[in-house]
Amino acid sequence: MKKSKDGDELLMNKPIIKERQSAVVRAFAFVACILSLASFAHSLSAQEVAYPDEFATPIPLMGEILGDFHFPISSDSALAQNFFDQGIQMMYAFAKLESARSFREAQVADPNCAICFWGEAWSWGSYLNGAMTTADAPRALAALKKALALIDSANEKEADLIRSLESRYIDNYDPEKRRIQDQAYADTMAGLSRKYPNDLNIATLYADALFLLEERRGYRRLEDPNVIRLHGVLESVLARDITHPGACHLYVHATESTPTPELAAPCAQFLGTAIPGASHINHMPSHTWNEMGLWEEAVRANTIAWHSDQKAAIGRGVAIYPTHNLTMLYYAAAMGGASASSIQASKDLAKLNGNSAMHAMSLVRFGRYDEVLALDNEPNGDVNRSMYLFSQGY
């Protein structure tokens, strides 16, 4: 069948059209693939460096909650400096999340502040009460990488602090194998403490690094070389500033399980008010007072701490380990014969975590046997249940 000229041209051009269509399809497919990979990479990055929900809300400057402690940085932004000081104080109080959020606001105030990113990286790391988690490890590493990228804007001391974390934060972090990184970090901080012998914060950070190498619990022998070294570093700070909140906090822990817990008493007298609204700092002197049998002082410290925990609901305190504060309050009051304080603390504890064992034991301590028998909220857990049942049978 004879085709028209136009038809012949159309027929002749079909391979060209198909080729062009195929090229367009391939181009669209390539772009779609790139976009898909980019989306996947972004999603993967978001999964690797995810942050707690609290980070969606900026943390304010805390004003009356904070103390006078100051850690000068090279930023020209007064706001960045204020948030940096807040971050340091929160970390010295073991309020890790509030610390990281404060350093974030310092970064917002001065995006070129390398040491502000160091602060965030430091706050995500291991500390006395726990190893860095696998969730926090990528957060720490991401903040460190930002600090390193901005390191030219830092002064020499800040740059040294930033680089000190390179030995501490690695890819593929394994909490079970962190001793290698912790030792390397402690060695680096030892060098910095020698380079900057008059910097009390660097010395405190060195002591913090040494503590990571120690068992958290258990008896400490005063003749142990590691204990001698740790005590020596902290005592060198406190000899120059007995009000240093970070050094005294660590020193209380470093001495409480030795034969001489009273060594921390001079600085403990100042520690409770060093960061007025941080409940853990309010509470910390009681570790020393309990070991010394100074029950009234321990009750007072933990009462203030519990008040700070409650004030956190209206933004006038920072709640840190509230159940621990109440447990120590119940115990110190029971030992000191303060029945009202002990029983009320045990009631508050039961409301907070559902554990009625302390309430039952406080009633036994003060001979309130009818009230013991009236209890009907048996707690969970073998130890707590055994205490509760003991009180019922007593």
Tell where the protein language model's regions lie, with residue ranges.
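Bacterial N-terminal signal peptides
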Residues: 28-39
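Residue at a conserved register position within TPR or TPR-like alpha-solenoid repeats
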Residues: 90, 124, 167, 210, ...
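N-terminal pre-domain segments of enzymes
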Residues: 47-76
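Solenoid-like repeat scaffolds
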Residues: 108-109, 195, 238-240, 270-277, ...
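Amphipathic alpha-helical repeat scaffolds of TPR domains
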Residues: 78-85, 113-124, 154-173, 198-218, ...
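Alpha-helical segment of the N-proximal tetratricopeptide repeat
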Residues: 79-102, 173, 391
